[in-house]
Each structure stands twice: as C-alpha cells, then as structure tokens.
Regions:
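Metallocofactor- and cofactor-centric catalytic cores in central/energy metabolism, strongly enriched
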Residues: 1-135, 148, 156-165, 171-178, ...
Length: 192
C-alpha cells in the first residue's frame, strides 16, 4: 500500500495558467464527538476479535492493511488496535483518511480537521513518506484491494440471518452513513 510512483508534484504548462489566487482560508471538515464508553467498548471488541483471529492464524502474524470507514466507531477501533500490544504496526489502505488514522495511510481523499491539517503542515517532513493519495480508480480498484489482502471494517446498522447488511439507512429513509467505496472494499477484502 505504501509503494510510490510518479512525482510529489503536478507538472503544469505555464501557458495554461490564467491566474493564481493566494489564500490562507483553511480547509474545513466536520469533526466528530469525543469517544464515549459505548464506542470505546465497540472499538475494543473489534480489536479483540482481530487479535484473536491473528492468534488462531486466520490473519497473518504480520497483520494486513486495514480499510476503515469514518466516524467515532472507526476512530475507537483504530485507537484500540493501536493500544493492543499483540497487533504489530500496520498500514492503512482506504478511500478516506480522517484524523484518527492520518499517521499511517494511503487514500484517495484526505479530510481532516483544521488542527490535524495544521499538524501535517507543521511536520511535513515526517508525513512526506507516510501518506500516499491516489485517484479513487486506484484506491477503490477491486483487483488492487484483493491483491493487498485488506481487512475491511465498516459500521453495520443491522444484519439479517443471511449475512445481508444495512450500513446506510435507519427506518428506511434516514441516511446514517454514506456508502462511498465501502462496497468495493467489502466485496474484495481478505476479511470483511
């Protein structure tokens, strides 16, 4: 997931530039509420489940790249995985990187809070070889996801006896989570 190709800049023909607008207006993203005991417990349960699967040999002892959605539960899972001494350092390969996973990632979109973005700017030398942004045609490509052996984690609202999962709607009409690229990862992951 951390392999790199290309250049760390975009080459543009100067004749095609019509104007440059300088601004110090920061990018903004919606933050998430602080973790509560319930989200912490969910995160710990998922981390314990993955650690047990690794101990049984279902997941390799080197672990696998992780794909995760966004939100309080995803942040709680990643926090619990980070604290678990039995799980080695791992890479992220996901469609969207948020604050909770910015220190290790590969994605097609970087959406972080203002404080996190400023932290990236302030420590660019550290992050330069840690973050890789790719077009979604690559990051969500089923063949790439399958080849990497990604562990896909997404929040499910409900599941039926046949394994069908509703991860978007409550009561049929209220949308709770966006679908995004989760389907690409879920169908092609090593474990989902």
């Amino acid at each position: 997931p951390s392999d790199r190709i290309g250049q760390p800049y975009i080459q543009v023909d100067p004749k095609k530039i019509v104007g440059i607008v300088e601004t110090n207006w920061p990018d903004e993203a919606r933050g998430f509420a602080d973790a509560d005991p319930l989200t912490d417990k969910i995160g710990q349960n998922v981390a314990d489940f993955l650690a047990a699967d690794m101990k049984r040999g279902i997941i390799p002892s080197t672990f696998l790249p992780l794909q995760s959605g966004v939100g309080n539960i995803a942040n709680a899972v990643l926090g619990a995985l980070g604290r678990d001494k039995t799980i080695p350092a791992f890479e992220m390969y996901t469609g969207l990187i948020r604050d909770g996973r910015v220190k290790f990632g590969s994605a097609c979109s970087l959406t972080v809070t203002n404080d996190c973005l400023q932290g990236i700017y302030d420590d660019m030398d550290f992050f330069r070889d840690k973050l890789v942004l790719r077009p979604s045609e690559i990051s969500n490509n089923p063949e790439v996801v399958r080849r990497l052996g990604v562990i896909s984690i997404n929040t499910a609202i409900e599941a039926d006896l046949y394994g069908n999962v509703n991860s978007t709607h409550i009561g049929g009409t209220k949308m709770m989570n966006g679908i995004g690229g989760s389907g690409d990862f879920t169908r092609n992951a090593y474990i989902s």
